[in-house]
């Protein structure tokens, strides 16, 4: 499990390899990841957008931006949490993802919340990022 905390917003990530969706002979490797966003702050926040930087084992970098997550822009009261799952295909056996969410606070102010860097590795090549 990977964790980062920004302004009382904790983001936890649990990546997992999806062997049944991967096709190594076609250089297609697929991972899922489960993210929990916990609002440990004293203000209500809304997740407005996401940004991902995905780097494969060859150093190829892809950037992904978009509104919300999995079609939602959840609002989190203090003490609330939101969990979702998504996935990422690569053409290499490993990679790294890192990113950030743009959140909106009570007064309309926007701020960024870090998504911790996490490694995508097939089980035979497991590594750990701290």
Swiss-Prot record:
Domain of life: Bacteria
Domain ApaG: 3-127
GO terms under biological process: error-free translesion synthesis
Gene3D superfamilies: ApaG domain (2.60.40.1470)
Cross-referenced Pfam families: DUF525
InterPro entries: ApaG_domain, ApaG_sf, Uncharacterised_ApaG
NCBIfam families: PRK05461.1 (NF003967)
Classification via HAMAP family: ApaG (MF_00791)
Name of the protein: Protein ApaG
Gene this protein is translated from: apaG
């Amino acid at each position: 499990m990977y964790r980062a905390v920004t302004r009382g917003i904790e983001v936890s990530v649990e990546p997992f390899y999806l062997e049944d969706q991967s096709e190594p002979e076609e250089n297609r490797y697929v991972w899922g990841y489960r993210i929990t966003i916990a609002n440990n702050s004293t203000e209500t926040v809304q997740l407005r957008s996401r940004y991902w930087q995905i780097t494969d084992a060859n150093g190829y970098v892809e950037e992904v931006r978009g509104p919300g997550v999995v079609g939602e822009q959840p609002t989190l009261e203090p003490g609330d949490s939101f969990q979702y799952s998504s996935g990422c295909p690569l053409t290499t056996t490993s990679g790294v993802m890192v990113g950030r969410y743009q959140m909106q606070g009570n007064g309309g102010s926007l701020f960024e919340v870090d998504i911790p860097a996490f490694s995508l590795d097939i089980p035979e090549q497991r590594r750990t990022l701290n």
